[in-house]
Regions:
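Alpha-helical transmembrane segments and adjacent TM-loop junctions that form the membrane-embedded core
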Residues: 2-23, 28, 34-302
Length: 302
């Protein structure tokens, strides 16, 4: 994974490119919708508008999240990305509901389409552009772990699926004269958008509610610490996903007869062992003598 400065630069670049592509696609799709009258193209254009708004939210969230810790936010600003992702999910869900209602109305009152050849070529070009953007965002997410870019990527994965559905609907309507294919395609797209919004919201809430890392990750932390020389035990492991980094705290047990300096060195080694697992991590080890009887978080957590 890249260092914090490179991560921040890469996230900003990805959000800027996404915003530029989204603005271009919504303009082209709106023009095609006006020319054809296709409700599925309207759905795709509206999804593009959500993409523009979402990319703006993402850009703002990424910029704020990239700020270093300050006096008022000593844990940093990483949760801004999760907030941006949650806002995106709300925008996507709202668009899905509105377009779903319009699609159902068109099912009962079909409307003739025009210039479908133009619409087909516009959708093919839009699909290629969205697929290229998804490829770039996938790379950025793998390198940085950005929640906001991942949420933005989910929008454009949806956009690819939306465009394919629109393409199928227009082809069926033009070549097989299925006059409800356009409305059915739009309704299917709306349902997919709503499902995608649900997943985005749940993922954002995991960070906002300070959910623990997976048990497998906690077991890796425990194994890494227990593998350090001088460590006799570990308990009260506490973790949370902060968006651009993870936060890990634990109590490490050492021989009670050693010096404070020696115990401090063991604590540092255990922290470094965890940082080796999570390069973008804040790790705090509390050193205490082995066998001490005290109140433990492990005993309170059910």
């Amino acid at each position: 994974m890249l260092n914090d400065s490179s991560n921040s630069t890469l996230r900003r670049l990805a959000s800027q490119v996404a915003l530029a592509v989204a603005v271009l696609l919504i303009g082209v799709k709106t023009w095609a919708w006006l020319a054809t009258g296709s409700i599925s193209l309207l759905t795709s254009a509206a999804d593009g508008l959500v993409d523009v708004l979402a990319s703006m939210v993402t850009f703002a969230g990424v910029r704020y999240a990239g700020r270093p810790p300050d006096q008022g936010h000593r844990y940093g600003h990483g949760k801004a990305e999760a907030i941006a992702a949650l806002i995106q999910s709300i925008l996507l869900a709202g668009a899905a509901v509105g377009l779903g209602i319009e699609s159902i109305q068109r099912l009962f009152v079909p409307q003739p389409l025009t210039e479908m050849g133009l619409g087909i070529w516009v959708i093919i070009g839009s699909t290629m552009a969205a697929a290229g953007l998804v490829t770039m965002q996938t790379y950025v997410v793998k390198r940085t772990g950005s929640t906001a870019i991942a949420a933005d990527r989910a929008h454009y994965v949806t956009d690819v699926a939306v465009n394919i559905a629109v393409l199928v609907a227009l082809v069926l309507e033009r070549f097989l004269a299925w006059n409800r294919a356009d409305s059915i395609g739009a309704l299917a797209i709306s349902c997919y958008m709503l499902w995608n919004a649900r997943g985005m919201a749940l993922h954002a809430l995991v960070q906002l509610l300070d959910s623990e890392l997976d048990m497998s990750e906690r077991e890796r932390i425990q194994s890494a610490v227990l593998g350090c020389a001088g460590v006799h035990g570990i308990h009260d492991i506490r973790t949370r996903d902060g968006g651009d980094r993870v936060f890990v705290e634990f109590h490490v047990e050492v021989d009670g007869q050693i010096s404070v300096e020696h115990g401090h060195d063991i604590g540092d080694r255990s922290e470094n062992a965890v940082k080796a697992l999570f390069p973008a991590a804040d790790v705090i080890a509390h050193v205490e003598p082995v066998g001490i009887q005290d109140e433990r978080l492990d005993d309170r957590v059910k």
